[in-house]
């Protein structure tokens, strides 16, 4: 009885283990926020700030979110998705980390920014710089940013190693480089110009038809002269057959294949002599 009761209890426990299974579905990931910046009081006076865990967290705008309107990282992206998520950047100083003072930034004189030259002038300067430096700037000159040329945007921005020039500006820059290269020439090579691929290539003119073959007749052989005389009317007959309208055979017009076979059979035996018998 004890053994049987133990077996029943084991079966009940086994059934309970197989039926009462609780599956917990993973919930949405918790949004992590940067730790608050702690203010400390240094020995020299004033207030300094300890650097947070992520120093540049949300200090720049996400370029992917700006261009496409969405980001695959969503809330976990380290860049700001909009101006409302931008955080003030921290600057390093001798006493520690501190936020830029608004009074200092307002009192600082504005920095004069040089006017941006037109794209064609930029390409012209790059071409001249690369040609004057020998082979050092050959890679940066002969290659442009394909993403900016084809799509009009580059994810690297100002840090891209290749110039951001469109297709129309490349053509204008190549014309400027060809004009400038004619004035002076390097001893080793001319200035390298940006090559523009051509989609259409000029088709060469159609070659004229070949002249008719010239037969060389040997006077010492009467057979060659007779064979050439017989071949001439046979060739003329073949041309006449080709120029004539398609004949009818059995109440129907002959196909082109039948006409070609007839023409071929006519020209095969054109060099045979009349009355000549094979020995």
From Swiss-Prot:
Give start-end positions of each zinc finger (C3H1-type): 56-84, 139-167
Pfam families in the cross-refs: zf-CCCH
Extract the ranges annotated as region (Disordered): 20-45
InterPro entries the record matches? ZFP36-like (IPR045877), Znf_CCCH (IPR000571), Znf_CCCH_sf (IPR036855)
For this UniProt record, the keywords arranged alphabetically read as follows:
DNA-binding, Metal-binding, Repeat, Zinc, Zinc-finger
- Superkingdom field: Eukaryota
- SUPFAM superfamilies, sorted: CCCH zinc finger (SSF90229)
Show the Gene3D superfamilies listed in the entry: Zinc finger, CCCH-type (4.10.1000.10)
**Keyword Heme annotated:** no
Q: Which GO terms describe its molecular function?
A: DNA binding; mRNA binding; zinc ion binding
Q: Name the PANTHER family on file.
A: CCCH ZINC FINGER/TIS11-RELATED (PTHR12547), ZINC FINGER CCCH DOMAIN-CONTAINING PROTEIN 1 (PTHR12547:SF167)
The name this protein goes by in its record: Zinc finger CCCH domain-containing protein 1
The species this protein was found in: Oryza sativa subsp. japonica
